Design a protein with these regions (language model features):
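Active-site-adjacent loop and "lid" segments of alpha/beta metabolic enzymes
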Residues: 29-36, 47-48, 52, 63-77, ...
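Phosphate-handling active-site elements
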Residues: 49-53, 213-214, 240-254
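Short, small-residue alpha-helix embedded
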Residues: 162, 224-247, 251
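Charged C-terminal helix
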Residues: 21, 72, 248-314
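Conserved phosphate/ATP/ADP-binding segment of small-molecule kinases
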Residues: 133-214
Length: 314
């Protein structure tokens, strides 16, 4: 018998006209350990109320102790993934993680330029595991091609200062504003600098422009070696911007989310600690019961983070 059913959703069916979750076009590598990469991005974005559109740029060969090798995808494969989904789904924010090769950087920078007006959150990881020549080629391409498309550059203080200010000769370390000034020479308006050392076992995390400090949040240093913290933070920031939160508030919320992820971190193998991006989904501890909190009082997404929907402001 002929099947005459129409697969097109009716107007009154769920999902037919509802806006749904804000979507982030997410470029990053596969990480088999789940420490970072696309796995971490998807979990972090979902936890704060956005939907990741993950585009695989390659794959690490790694365990929880460290990265042993990387296999980059061909730029044609990366481009086909991105264009196919972007032609179907409206994109609120583009998130850039590790792209794997100068060729992929060139392609993704061109794509970001085609989406003029869509914010780009770019994260620069520590690349010390890689070969020196590949590091230099990658950083040069990222500086020349990707930074001019970047709205917010995210990275650890030591990583960004060595990259953007290699000839720094001051008696003090460069400040976040110094780093922001260097990034602004390539067109980056905001830099989120993490891990700025402070006295008494604290660290500062600073959203800065060349002219001013926009946000700074101090946290107590956690005595553990983590993998995936930078991916978690940049993914959460991109997702919160996609939902409509303005940049200063999104930065604060992303930092608080990261702190909770690290505080609840776990060690699945013999190496580093992994952020628990789903801390809110774990069973309530006895201490919460003693405090009189009802079971299940901590929940994810827009209600928890009080995120207005889809009104991104820079």
């Amino acid at each position: 018998m002929t099947d005459t059913r129409d697969d097109t959703p009716a107007d009154d069916e769920p999902g037919s006209d509802t806006p749904g979750l804000a979507c982030v076009l997410d470029f990053n590598a596969n990480d088999p350990s789940g420490s970072g990469g696309l796995t971490g991005d998807v979990l972090a974005m979902g936890s704060v109320g956005a939907h990741s559109l993950p585009v695989v740029t390659g794959s690490y060969a790694r365990d929880t102790s460290g990265i042993h090798d990387f296999y980059a995808f061909d730029e044609d494969a990366v481009g086909e993934q991105a264009r196919t989904i972007a032609e179907d789904v409206p994109v609120q924010v583009i998130k850039v993680g590790f792209l794997g090769s100068p060729e992929n950087i060139a392609l993704i920078a061109e794509l970001a330029d085609d989406y003029d007006g869509v914010p780009v959150v770019a994260y620069m990881p520590n690349l010390s595991w890689w070969e020196d020549e590949k590091i230099d080629d990658y950083l040069d391409a990222f500086r020349e091609l990707m930074l001019p498309q970047t709205s917010v550059l995210v990275g650890h203080h030591s990583t960004l200062r060595r990259w953007l200010l290699p000839d720094w000769e001051g008696e003090r370390y460069p400040s976040p504003r110094d780093i922001a000034r260097a990034a602004s020479e390539q067109g980056v308006p905001y830099v989120l600098v993490t891990g700025v050392p402070l006295p008494e076992q604290h660290i500062d995390n600073v959203l800065a422009t060349p002219e001013t400090v926009v946000v700074h949040e101090k946290f107590e240093r956690i005595e553990a070696v983590f993998a995936g913290a930078g991916d978690t933070l940049s993914a959460a920031l991109a997702a919160l911007l996609a939902t409509g939160m303005d940049l200063p508030e999104a930065t604060r919320e992303a930092l608080v989310y990261l702190d909770r992820c690290l505080d609840e971190g776990f060690r699945p193998g013999m190496g580093q600690v992994i952020p628990d991006r789903l801390f809110w989904a774990q069973p309530e501890e006895a201490e919460h019961e003693e405090d009189g909190e009802p079971e299940g009082s901590l929940s994810p997404g827009n209600d928890y983070f009080e995120v207005p929907f889809n009104e991104t402001k820079h």
